[in-house]
Amino acid sequence: MSASHKKPTPTELASDAHKNRRVVNTVNRPTRNTPYHDRTEAGECLAQEILLALSGGGPATSPGHRLKGTSPLARREPVVVLGLCRGGVPVARTVARLLRVPFDFLVVRKLASEANPELAIGALAECGRTDSGRDVGKKEVPQKRLRSDARRGQKPGEPAQESGLPPDLERTFGVIEVLNRDILAHLPDAEAALTSARDRETEELRRRVMRYRAGKAPERLEGRRVILVDDGAATGATMRAAIASARKQGAAEVIVALPVAPEEVCGELRHEADKVICPWTPAFFMSVGSHYTHFPQIEDEEICEVIQRQE
C-alpha cells in the first residue's frame, strides 16, 4: 500500500470524527434541549461551543471556568465579542470574560409597523468607521436587502445632517439598515410604514448610542474576527443588521453565536455569516424568553453597569 493511501489508525479516525461532530453540533444538530437558567448560563454554554468550534475541537472548559493566560482564539488573530443590545450584552460579556477576549456592544433596533409590532420588516444597527477612516454608514450597501441610512430622514446621496452626538462619537456614528422585502411587498402602505418605523427606531438607536457609549467611540472591527452574540433569535432580523454592520466596518470574519434559535433562522444566517454557532435549535420555537427559566427585561441602567465594569 502506498504512503499516499495509508490506512488511518483508529486514533486518527476517532480524532477526525470528534472534530467533525463538534463543528456540526455547534451549527446544525443541537447539543442542548433544556432551558437555560439565565443569560449568564447561556453565555457559559456559548463560550464552550465557540472554543470548540473555532479551535479545532480542542478540550472544552467546564461551565464558569475562565481560561488561564491568553485565549487560544486571541493567539491566532485579533478577536472581539460584540453583544447586541440589550439582551445580548450580558451573554456576550460572559463569553468575552471566559474566553479572555475584548468585549464591546452593538446597538440594534428592529423595524416593525405600528399595526403589527411583532412583524419584523427590517432592522437597524449602528455602524462606525474602519481604521482607515473610511465612512461606513452613509452610503448604499451593494448587497441584497441592505441599505444604509446615516441620519434620520436622510436619503442616499444627501448631505449628512447633524446628529446631536458628541464630536468624538459623531465621527464614528452611522446607521445601516436591513430590510425584509418579502414582507414589505405584502404590507399595505409599506412605504409609509417603513418611513415611520425608520424615523422612530433611528431616533431610539441614537438615544441608546449616546447613553451607552457616553461619548466614546466603539471598538475598531477592521481586520478582526468578530463574534456577534445575542440571547437568542426569533426572526434573525437584528442579527442580519449586525452582520451587515460588521462586514461594512471591515471585519475579517463574522461569527454568529446564539444560545437558541429556530433551525430555519440559523440556516438563513449561514448565508450571511462565516459561521453560525447555536447549541439549541428547538423543533417548537415559541419565543426567546420561553427557553430561559429566568429572563428579565434588560434596562438601560444594567447595560451601563456592564459597560462600566468592563472599563
Where are these regions (language model features)?
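PRPP-associated nucleotide enzymes
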Residues: 2-311
